[in-house]
Amino acid sequence: MAKRRPKKPMLKFPKRMQKKMIVMFTVVAALMIGLIGRLMYIEYTSGEKYEKIVLAQQGYDSQTIPYQRGDIVDAKGTVLATSIAVYNVILDCSVLNDDEKYVEPTINALVSCFPDLTSEQLYSYLKDSPDSRYIVLAKRLSYDTIQPFVNLQEERDEKGKLVNPYIKGVWFEKEYQRQYPYGKLASSVIGFTTSGNLGINGLENYYDDTLNGINGRQYGYIDGDDNLQRTTEAAVDGYNVYSTIDATIQGIVEKYLKKYNDENKDSTREGNGAQDAACIVMDVHSGEVLAMASYPTFDLNDTRNPEALIGSKLIDVSGNSTDTVINEEIAASMKQEENNDLLVQNLNALWKNYCINSTYEPGSTMKPFVAAMGLEDGRLKGDESFECTGIIEIGGYKIRCHNYTNGAEGWLSIGESIERSCNVTLIRMAQVIGIDEFLKYMSEYNFGLKTNIDLAGEARTASLVFNSSTMGPTELATSSFGQGFNVTMIQMITGFCSLINGGYYYEPHM
């Protein structure tokens, strides 16, 4: 006979532990009651809202509402860049295939209103993609173009009933297309956009975040009566950018840059009158840029047209400039797909803003700065005269005055030295100023530093100017007439403004 197992003694919790467990169960029960109450409250107050969200997720896709990118306007309010509404024609095959009576009226309406569409093409969409709800039939049409179809959809008789109730499954997706009313005007300053409202170059790039907005969204849901309802989150449009550019002054500057190039085309060499020509007009008392132009230019509404490259030097696929001048034949060949890399290299050069992107030796435009250095420092009193001997030897190099062939200029005042652009007398002024002071004022005038103008791509020149370890007597001499170092146009004009306005250096801005 088997022995009975002894019963295990009952586990007995200490009173302290029992109290803790009671408290714990009470808290859990209270939390559960609170949670159930909260769920009941949500169901009572917001149940319909969340039900609609679930239904929308189950049966309907949300639709993006595009924002409108801000305008770029000139100082007087003239619109230089704007965004216009355009429409994509969208076909919902699932709606048409849901009822055969919709097919023929809808296809006939589409073909009659949009000549580029054919009934064969539309029937093939219905057959090959019967469940598709999004087929793009046409892109970026103006409202005037889609209006005849919209009128057919919305036309009503005297009793208010739809005249064409079986035109279904077609809707228009709104988006915005960038447009530049003045085409080529200020093209290198304004810049342009690519798909997705991405600013390329100029103000479009620098103020990209300001100009762009936030897309809205429209959601569909099924209500209690099985009707489709919609809720909308509105788009937030971008801000406008008000520039300092004066379209009238800009137009005059561009007119004469083009005139010069047209008059000198193929004169001394094949191609444009100048490889690069540019001009800046600035308010000396504020640093506001009233006009900034480069030549050659391009149409902002047709930025990839290779015909704009005709007359410029060809740049190879590696980015190196060649001696070949682009003609009509070369430009036409760039339209071929296999030459896309070549086209891109040359367009990138065309799209650059020479006024801020490129550097050059300033030459004799540096001479007023040298005179101002000496006068400001006190090492020049203003009544000195310096002798031009026609030639001067510095560090073993013979440096000539530009008028050397006609003899020496003789004794010249500071003003006469600048007026006659005499290299020799400017060298003598620089020697009086000295290397240390000369370099100090080069920095004061911002040479070698960025101006921080509000345009993308300002060139760095820190390595293109002399410093205390690279400037000797010869470099001091050549720098006095603007050779041996590089500047940008925006550096030069901003510095010049400080010479004119009493010594105030204003940060240039657009």
Regions found by a protein language model. Give the residues of each.
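Periplasmic/cell-envelope proteins involved in peptidoglycan metabolism and beta-lactam response
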Residues: 1-332, 359, 436-444
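Beta-lactam-recognizing serine transpeptidase/beta-lactamase-like catalytic domain environment
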Residues: 5-8, 79-82, 87, 222-234, ...
